[in-house]
Amino acid sequence: TMLDKQFLFPVFNADSFGRITAYKNVGEAINDLTDKGEEVPNHIALNHSDIVVRRYELIPEGGKLPKPEFLPEDIRRKNFGNTYTRLSRNEVSSTIVPGNNALPVHPTLNRSLTPREAARIQTFPDDYIFMGDRRSQCIQVGNAVPPLMAAKLAHCVDMYIDGIEYDGIQPDQSFYVNTDNDFSGIQSKAKRATLKFGDLFSGAGGFTRGLEQAGLECVLGAEWNDYAVEAYRKNFGHECLQIDLSTEENQELVAKRLKDAHVDLVVGGPPCQGFSIFGNRRFVNTKS
């Protein structure tokens, strides 16, 4: 932040926010989907091979695949033999990551989670639609900012900008920048209807969903992936630019659009580091 005060992050709680439902554990989030099929949007099960299913059968609820020496020889893995994990219905989920076969194993079924089950855990409602084939849907869900987290952050941002005192925490690595810029143009809550924001590297729109539920108004999204843009446009009525933000020309274009719209803040989930296995944009060597 460039305001002359420290931003405090939300205090942890497991409460729902507005129309975004919080679940206390995996079972509460997805148990009702166990007997349902593809009539539920994005509820598409992966067709695992017989070998993979046999491995899954050996994983206890809340546990991992046994070490290779304890497995039948024909289903042992040469690498990453202990990375298969099965969720527990009575615990919170491990982090949802992107990838067609990257989702954790269902608590009771011998398959990985469906995109919809993963989206439930990420706090997306069932009417929030992800686009493309199953692999693309898994990537969109795994890359998404959970709307519930975004909403609680946005609530703190709103109070922070309005100068309202609130309970919050200061992470060890947080900081603020004190500048000589003039922020007198930021209107008080009494003078504006709501905070306006732009969502860069928006993906399928988890950040936007959460911030809008907190009462903020998105004026522009920006994303380069075909299916993510399609999903964003499916779920929101405002404009989403399909644009590569690695070029200076496009950066200036988006900056002008946001300035013209008089946004109060910019949010975004930038891509992983260039050297990451998930990083498709390797135009910068972030190691150095």
Residue spans for each PLM region:
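Class I S-adenosyl-L-methionine
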Residues: T1-K78, L253-D260, F278-S288
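Hydrophobic alpha-helix-in-membranes signature
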Residues: F9, P146, G269-P270
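Soluble or luminal CAZymes and related metallo-dependent hydrolases
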Residues: A22, M149, W224
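Residues that flank catalytic or metal-binding motifs in active/ligand-binding sites
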Residues: V26, V92, F236
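C-terminal target-recognition/interaction regions appended to catalytic cores
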Residues: L33-A193
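Core alpha/beta nucleotide-donor-binding catalytic domains of modification enzymes
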Residues: F183-S288
